[in-house]
């Protein structure tokens, strides 16, 4: 059973470096999405995106995304729940998040009810 409800206030970016500039030191969850906004991979940055993608790493992601129209979505979260939010999102969408290797086989020990606000990515379930 979820023990806490949290609304994620999503922000959309066309480059990882833009997202990093907006959330340099704030704990956040980020989504790498396709050009239609469909979530493909979830990540957490418990110390902000500057620490997670410092220096040339952000630019390397921008270069890899160049011409694809792929998107990055970021939602600030309290650092105390950053890992739990990432785990919950991966668990709920484990069938389609093939780029997330951890968290797809066992439900998180700390369960959260997540709601999505702002400019949210599209979270889709796999066709059954």
Residue ranges and their predicted role:
Residues 1-40, 45-128:
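Boundary/linker segments flanking structured domains
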